[in-house]
Each structure stands twice: as structure tokens, then as C-alpha cells.
């Protein structure tokens, strides 16, 4: 079993970046080369940042932008709001090591891992850290914690792996009077039961991705949920954010994997029934995607998959993203569903090759011979080509049959197979994007992501419109920047569009541009019938659009459900939903207060939060 299951994970991973302490993309000053976490040089990355991101001519050197030290950041922590009677009673039911009031524990439980989070913590812009970190060992501990929190009106913020990128784990800064505790679930990482005949297993939800599969592999099973955050995120986090993994085409999204759960709410424990199919109202659906706003999920029954006999991942090139999209849509209509099918637009394709450490593959892509073949023989525009990675898992017969059908479709659209090397490289590097983001952040760049889910009718139009809106924001601000997109997670009716964007960082005003990008993109995505997020969760980043997305009646129904389970609003306030109405408050006054207490347009903007406190 991974040692992180018997020690406290937050003491081993970075407080100001992604992953374990000491693991990062380094910069070799002598050779002027970024060095990947695998020790290999990323020979084309700086050229990409110069040509595609900044679009500058002449000599180009990156500049390190070191953040605060841990000691300096700790000095910036506001003093805690400690409700002593709550702490005293908590000490009677939990052991000493489960209650952390120290500064480092507080520092490591403030933020998630998006650009805005890390930009602020690296600069000591800390508005509302938790006042204590509590580490339950089991479900019963969670019940005791919640009962006391309800009794003493203490705010509870669930914390899994801390990998959230929409503000889901950050305490609400408008909680200036109530004590806020962060519940770190990672001690709860055990598999409690497995039913190999039915194909189910019961886990505590603080279990990390690798530890789920390590425990299941002893029985010849796996879960099949493989998000980018896999190594550091938890089952509870996946449930809370309505997560999706890279292999969702075959194994499903998290809501397809959860069969039952235990939830500790302020008014009692909810246990959803375990059966082959729900009847009536599906209570599981009420808690998946709820981000701790209704209570604390402690245990979950998940469906499990046999370890595949065969795994084959390979790369293809198409003349354009539009052609690749039509090809994969054709596959979907024909019922051809590979485990993974990721289509990169022309910009994301260039980033994929530029960030690679596979010298053979990259050299081939950038070689004159290859370019001549693409331009002369294939008749393609090199600047428009689209990389596609597909994966097949299952029995040998299943994968061969599925691949044969897919090859027929792809070749009909003129695609060129690159073999298994790109697929294997993607498998090895698929968790690396956050390290690239951290490298950018440490060298005067900013980088982040957003995503949506759209119908096929709207997908290409939405892709074009989002990229156009990004270019317009940059032009309005006199900045150069880059945006790329890939699509994955294909469904019968639509797919996910996942955008990555990078720009040069000058000063704190760049965060205002960052927010302009997100606002403009959100408007465009909603205009094209996109949703607020495919798998990142609502957090506080998407709360401003929840009423528009759900409708007034829909949002009111969700808020009344929360009120029934959480009458004092102690469960992760400020996330998922606007602030609840107060007694005797007029609708107009409620709307005005909700706007004042929206975190989206205030966090990290100098003076914005203070003006509304």
C-alpha cells in the first residue's frame, strides 16, 4: 500500500505547485533548455513559447519568477478564527494528531491548483485560509466532526487531493466570523469490501487514484477512471466535481461508476441503496457533482472492471481538426467506441510535439522530409494538421475488431497512421500538463484551462467562436497569447471541448485579462449550448452562471435541497450555489448581496475583495 495512505499527504506534496516536492520541469541555464521530470530535454518548448505564445522576433530568453518561500508565505497567513468550545469538544472525540491548528497545515489547505490559485499563493495573496485542518480516520469520525460543526455553527470544507481547478476547496472569504475547518480525507483510503462476482467494490473516498487500482489489482480488477489528476486526486474529489477520465468512452464518467454512497450531512447520514439500477428518484445523482455543499461523502460503492488483456494506443494525423472531428463523429454514429479518442486542433498539436521529449517522434514531425511529404504527397497545409490519439483496451479479439473498423473510417478521411509510438508517449506523459503550467508560472508566463460539453451540432462552431473570443480579448489588451483545444469524452449526442491557453505575464493586471478570457469564453460556450464545465466542477468559478444554466426554478430547487440538508449553510458555502436568501430579505436585496459575495470576480484582483467585505 502506498505510504501516503498511512502518513499525511499534504506534508509530502508542494504547497505552491503540482505534485511531490522536488518533482518539476527544471531549466538548464547553461544549455537554455527545459528539462522534463523524466530528465530528458524539451528541445522545442522554448521555440514554441517564443513563436506561438509571445510571437516575438530575435533573441528570446525566459526569466525565472520565484515566488515566496514557505516561511514567507506562512507570515502572510491571517490569524485564525478559533471557536474554542468546538475545538475542546473535538479533542474529546478525536486524537491529537487528527486536529491540526499549525500554520503549515493551514497554508496547504487554502487553494486548489489552477493558475489563479498558484499565482496568489506564490505571492502571498492569502485572503481566507482555513482555521484548522481535521483528518478523519473513518466514517464515524466524519459523523462526529459534522455533528459538532452543526452544533457550533462551524463551516466545513471537504478537501481530497486539493487538485481542484475551479476554487472548490478555498474557504469563502466572506466567512469572517465563523470558524472554517478543512476536512482532509486522505487518511480514509481503504477498500472495505469487494464483490468480484457482481463487479463492485466499497472504498473510503479519501483513497487516491493509484491506491484504488493497486488494491483492486490484487483481485485482477481496476476502476477505469483515469483523470489528468489521477496520481493526486481522490475518489471523493471525483464524485464531488462530477469527474471524467481519459478512458471514459469505454468505462464511463464517474456518475456511471458510482452505485451507492454514504453521505454525512448536518441533519444526519444519508445512505443510498445498493442495487443493479435505482428506482424512483436517484439519490446518487443528487450528490454526484455537489462539491460538499450538501454534506461529506465518506464511502462509495463503485463498479470495477477486469484488467484488460490487451492495451493498444496509437497516433494518427489528419489534414485538419475539422476533418478529424468528422471522422470521429462518423465512428461514434457507427458505434465504434475506442477506449480513448483525443483530437488535438492545429495549435494543440504543435504544443503536443513541442512539449515532447521523444526525440525521434519530434524530429520526424519537424524534419524537412516529413514536411515535404505532408505538403507534396498528401497535399496538406502543415499549419493545419491535427494529431489524434486513440486507445483500445479489452480482449485481443475485441481490440482487433474495433481497430479494424476505426482504421476503415480514418483512412476514408485520408488520415495517416503514425503507429504506436505517439500513443505510448501520450500514455507515459498524460499527467504532465500541470508541470508544464507550473514551469510557465515560474518563468513569467501564465497558463490555465477551461472546458465544456457541447452537442455535435454546435461543437465546431463553439470551438471556432471560443478561439475567436480569446484572440479578441488579447487584441483589446495589446497582448499576444496562445490557445489550443482538444476534444475527448465522446458521447452519443456530443463531446467535451477542452481549451488550454498561455500568455506572457507582466504584472498583477494580467489576472484581470485572465478573468476577461474566462467571462468571454463562458458567454460564447453558453450561446452554443455548452455547459459550464465538463468535469472540473462548479467551485466558485462558475457560480455566476448557475442561474442562467439551470433556470430560476431549477436553481431554486437545488437551493431548497441544500437548505433541507444544511439549514445553517455550513457545508462549503460560496461553492456550487450563490449565497442563500436571509430571512426577511427582499429578492432584490438577496440578489445584491449574492453579487457582492460572488468570489469569481474578486479573488486575486487587488482591492476587489476588501471593497465588498
UniProtKB/Swiss-Prot annotation:
Q: Could you say which EC number(s) this protein's record lists?
A: 2.5.1.26
Where in the cell? Peroxisome
UniProt-annotated site: Important for enzyme activity, residues: 342
All copies of the FAD-binding PCMH-type domain together span 126-307
Active-site residues annotated for this sequence: 498
From the UniProt record, list the reaction(s) this protein catalyses.
Answer: a long chain fatty alcohol + a 1-acylglycerone 3-phosphate = a 1-O-alkylglycerone 3-phosphate + a long-chain fatty acid + H(+)
Q: Which cofactor does it need?
A: FAD
| GO CC annotations on file | peroxisome
Which biological pathway? Glycerolipid metabolism; ether lipid biosynthesis
- Which key words tag this protein in UniProt? FAD, Flavoprotein, Lipid biosynthesis, Lipid metabolism, Peroxisome, Transferase
Role of this protein: Catalyzes the exchange of an acyl for a long-chain alkyl group and the formation of the ether bond in the biosynthesis of ether phospholipids.
Cite the record's note on assembly: Homodimer.
Task: Please report the name of this protein according to its UniProt entry.
Answer: Alkyldihydroxyacetonephosphate synthase
Give the source species: Trypanosoma brucei brucei
Lineage of the species this protein comes from = Eukaryota, Discoba, Euglenozoa, Kinetoplastea, Metakinetoplastina
